[in-house]
Amino acid sequence: MISVESLTKTYGGFTAVDDVTFTAATGRVTGFLGPNGAGKSTTLRILVGLTPATAGTATIDGRRFTDLPNPGREVGVLLDASAQHAGRTGREILTVAQRTMGLPTSRVQEMLDLVSLTDDEADRRVRNYSLGMRQRLGIATALLGDPHVLILDEPANGLDPAGIRWMRDLLRGYADRGGTVLLSSHLLHEIEVIADDLVVIGNGRIVAQGTKSELLASVGTVVRSRDDVALGRALQAADIDHTVRPDGGIHTDAGTDRVGEVALAAGLVLTELRHADGAGLEEMFLELTADTQREGVAA
């Protein structure tokens, strides 16, 4: 399990991460979302020991990353697919990591096969790799030590639709086998499809966290009648706050039973009475981070 407690990082007078607390549970995929500059990458860098925290803790199974004796055997990390030795081949990069971790040489070919890098591609210099190939190599390196935790920052960048689906299936299977995945991505649809839990950060602070079903759950009631004006007056008389929907009908936070009772007492015939649809991830994300967004920036 990943545990972040009261984590703070300041640079002079600027606070990049401000009292952040969250967990990423075993056997689950946790989506870590936020606009550009919200503190996602800084949090992940602190978690894997690349940036010191000003205050607070970030641990993996109760230990700091820097205290792990052979971290690659316990935690797989991919923060920047372009941060690879451009003059080495993909196979050489994996071989160096394999020897550092004390793994059998066969593990290199196993990982190349897993991420679908051919022998020809594996023997090319990384400077000649596309971004998608670098992402696959980064995933291979992260999984090389058979870790039980994965920490990934934008791992789908540069992947085509087939590659994104491959990534999704890979991470879903990894979590289902008992692994812990902390995943940062600006591809909100992919996060919505794969994540079990969500953590949303804005201006360095957590603005929402919980299971995906909790955060995207439906709230309130949608109701229509043959006379929505009269229905609105009846709801107002019953002290039930409500709003008129742009596409017709009324939305209220009251439950369906209560709304139905009010309509019955007013002698109104309802043509629709249902729980409100849950918000999509994009809608929820934009609403929660509205104060931190720049025009045209989604994550």
Where are these regions (language model features)?
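ABC transporter nucleotide-binding domain
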Residues: 167-253
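Alpha-helix N-cap/helix-start and coil->helix boundary motif
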Residues: 8, 65, 91, 188, ...
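Structural motif corresponding to alpha-helix initiation and N-cap regions
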Residues: 41, 105, 123, 134, ...
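ABC transporter nucleotide-binding domains
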Residues: 2-4, 9-183, 188-189, 193-202
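Residues that scaffold the ATP/ADP-binding catalytic core of kinase and kinase-like folds
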Residues: 68, 142, 215, 284, ...
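ATP/adenylate-binding site constellation spanning eukaryotic-like Ser/Thr protein kinases
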Residues: 62, 72, 90, 203, ...
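C-terminal coupling/interaction segments
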Residues: 255-299
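Extracytoplasmic/periplasmic regions of membrane proteins
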Residues: 118, 229, 239-242, 257-260, ...
